[in-house]
UniProtKB/Swiss-Prot annotation:
GO cellular component terms, A-Z: chloroplast
Organism this protein belongs to: Petunia hybrida (Petunia)
Keyword match Nucleotide-binding: no
Pfam families recorded: Aminotran_1_2
Protein name as catalogued: Bifunctional aspartate aminotransferase and glutamate/aspartate-prephenate aminotransferase
Binding site for L-aspartate: G111, W197, N247, R449
Length: 479
């Protein structure tokens, strides 16, 4: 069967002006990233003869025009139609395509450490292959790894979990979505402080739950106001998702604030908490990390999520985990058994080696964190010198979430209007050839996210490009 494909113009995110040779003509056309809906022309062979069947889309049905009329329903489920594609993935993919086409784009959109996986971890993975550890593992993960995670949580986080209260998955993202699916019923509410990681609201929608967004402000370092949380709680409130250190802001919740939040949570029997702690080791003193489940009364209602991608530079190894009360972990385990089954045996052997590097990853992780801190300090200083920029200094992770809204409401010759974070990021890609993520992807349209998971020299070049591009924009005089 041969098929030719054309693309509808629905479902697109305005973003780029570059035409890339060899790619679909609409996938990187001026100002757009496209998510295609396909129309097909089918060519079939039958009884030695060939009939052309041309299709057109009518609503959600493809009408096959031939001697025989066949209708094929290509509609998608309401669930998947309610979910937005990830902007961070789309922008990262587009920036990569531009680079491959010869456009010298500096990519600061992806949340991926630029360091190689530490050598002892790599060696453990290689040895796993050589020694024949290449078969299926138990769905929940190997006992060796779950025991190592149990020890880590006890020593580093003050949390007591047995191996059967831990589930290893193909990345922390899988751990989170399985938890949301396990505890949420249709109509339940999932409370999410904004700015948020792009996937949290979509995960709630996939579970037929309703995301309830709790806005924060840059003046308060993007930290959740406990009073706002309490005002938004209803009988439908089922889940609160916390991320500290935060993607996209780098904010770190101090213990005192977490205790205030815990006091509110304790008054609501239905309310559970997912504590996303994937960036726990990428933290800058004097900030410290507190696991939410370690607070009084919170162990029974908290699902702690972590993984190996960020601190150990193991993004491609795809390994995360969740720990919590056995009742909830068993439910997540059941879902995983029907989704993916167990995670990679090779990655699990490598993860055991990662946890064996020492407390908080030892010197290898400390060296990476030192570099991240130097980069953060450079960016905070550099952007602090630019007129109209507001900054909340990150205390962890490797993102700078800066307010550039003073540059909105401007018409730029040869480009057009800059009215929001998306058009500003598109302008910076077009004018400065720097790929960033608009803040509206994270629930705050006043800001843009810059990943400093790149070398200092790369960041210096990016800052110079951004400064030159912003010079042509005259920010409105503050009232």
């Amino acid at each position: 069967m041969a098929a030719t494909t054309t693309t509808s113009s629905s479902s697109r995110i305005a973003y780029s002006r570059h035409n890339i040779p060899g790619l679909h003509s609409d996938s990187l056309n001026p100002k757009s990233i496209s998510f295609s809906s396909n129309l097909h022309t089918f060519s079939l062979k039958s009884s030695g003869s060939r009939r052309q069947l041309y299709s057109r889309r009518t609503g959600a049905v493809v009408i096959m025009q031939s001697m025989d009329k066949v209708e094929v329903d290509i509609s998608l489920s309401p669930r998947v139609n309610s979910v937005k594609p990830s902007k961070t993935v789309a922008i990262t993919d587009q920036a990569t395509a531009l680079v491959q086409a010869g456009v010298p784009v500096i990519r600061l959109a992806a949340g991926e450490p630029d360091f190689d996986t530490p050598a002892p971890i790599v060696e453990a993975g290689i040895n796993a292959i050589r020694e024949g550890h290449t078969r299926y593992t138990p769905n929940a993960g190997t006992m060796e790894l779950r025991s190592a995670i149990s020890h880590k949580l006890k020593e580093e986080n003050g949390l007591s979990y047995t191996p059967d209260q831990i589930l290893v998955s193909n990345g922390a993202k899988q751990s989170i979505i399985q938890a949301v699916l396990a505890v949420c019923s249709p109509g339940d509410e999932v409370l999410i402080p904004a700015p948020y990681w792009v996937s949290y609201p979509e995960m709630a929608r996939l579970a037929d739950a309703t995301p309830v967004i709790l806005p924060t402000s840059i003046s308060e370092d993007f930290l959740l106001d406990p009073k706002l949380l309490e005002s938004k709680l209803t009988e439908k409130s089922r889940l609160l998702i916390l991320c500290s250190p935060s993607n996209p802001t780098g904010s770190v919740y101090p213990r005192k604030l977490l205790e205030q939040i815990a006091e509110i949570v304790a008054r609501h029997p239905r309310l559970l908490v997912i504590s996303d702690e994937i960036y726990e080791h990428i933290i800058y003193a004097p900030a410290t990390h507190t696991s939410f489940a370690s607070l009084p009364g919170m162990w029974d209602r908290t699902l702690t999520v972590n993984g190996f991608s960020k601190a150990f530079a193991m993004t491609g190894w795809r390994l995360g985990y969740i720990a919590g009360p056995k009742h909830f972990i068993a439910a997540c385990n059941k879902i995983q058994s029907q989704f993916t089954s167990g995670a990679s045996s090779i990655s699990q052997k490598a993860a055991v080696a990662a946890l064996g590097l020492g407390y908080a990853g030892g010197e290898l992780v400390a060296t990476m964190v030192k570099s991240f801190r130097e980069r953060r300090d450079y960016l905070v200083k550099s952007f602090g010198e630019i007129e109209g920029v507001k900054i909340s200094e990150p205390r962890g992770a490797f993102y700078l979430f800066i307010d550039l809204s003073s540059y909105y409401g401007v018409e730029v010759d040869g480009f057009g209007s800059i009215n929001n974070s998306e058009s500003l990021c598109r302008y910076l890609l077009d004018k400065a050839q720097v790929a960033l993520v608009p803040g509206d992807a994270f629930g705050d349209d006043t800001c843009i996210r810059i990943s400093y998971a790149a070398s200092l020299s790369t960041l210096q070049a990016a800052v110079e490009r951004i400064k030159k591009a912003l010079v042509t924009i005259k920010p409105p005089v503050p009232v």
